[in-house]
Amino acid sequence: MSILEINNLHVSIEGKEILKGVNLTLKTGEVAAIMGPNGTGKSTLSAAIMGNPNYEVTQGQILLDGVNILDLEVDERARLGLFLAMQYPSEIPGITNAEFMRAAMNAGKADEDKISVRDFITKLDEKMALLGMKEEMAERYLNEGFSGGEKKRNEILQLLMLEPKFALLDEIDSGLDIDALKVVSKGVNEMRGKDFGAMIITHYQRLLNYITPDLVHVMMDGRIVLSGDAALATRLEKEGYAGIAQDLGIEYKEES
């Protein structure tokens, strides 16, 4: 079992503090949902864990199996088994999907450990079929001209190919219709097992109807203020964040 620990994490952007002391433990074998209103720091948390240089960690630790990874670059964190599926994936002209994924799978490996072309194609075909993706998607430039739904499927395809220890899934349900949501959820559920953990960031219960979390954490004002099981997400759907904030004595203003 691998453990990702976030201890008293404070993160600022351009001098403004966004995370104000986050404490969180993720374990392989578990799926945790991070829920909360807009602007509360959910995406900042995933970016800080992955090492985005635009986010300054001013205090705290991020430990992967007991080792503080704060001084590691993004690619080093990825090689240790961290994966981030972004809400708005970048387009990279000139590099095909297949080229990108094979390079990512072989990064940092000795020649004898690199996946062969044959094994790569076999695995790629299998995972694309699982997600209902056309074969031509493999030869298109990375995310270039992709629809929102295609980009999200492509992020999950990368997840299935790379098989990380921990996936940070930042609003993968954003902008998806119900059919695309089911496909994306199917891909995430395919990964579930004792060697995989996930942190799913979402505003809504809808995604969690298809990916049942083991744990639900509610973020407000840069902190985790409440934790529970899947029933907590259902409660949020009924009461909204205002009800939770009132119970906890937290000042909260609903968006108009």
UniProtKB/Swiss-Prot annotation:
Subcellular location: Cell membrane
Binding site for ATP: 36-43
Membrane topology: Peripheral membrane protein
Taxonomy, superkingdom: Bacteria
GO molecular-function terms, A-Z: ATP binding; ATP hydrolysis activity
One GO CC annotation: plasma membrane
Keywords on record: ATP-binding, Cell membrane, Membrane, Nucleotide-binding, Transport
Domain (ABC transporter) ranges: 4-246
Coiled coil, from the record: none
Family statement: Belongs to the ABC transporter superfamily. Ycf16 family.
Name listed for the protein in its UniProt record: Probable ABC transporter ATP-binding protein M6_Spy0273
Species of the source: Streptococcus pyogenes serotype M6 (strain ATCC BAA-946 / MGAS10394)
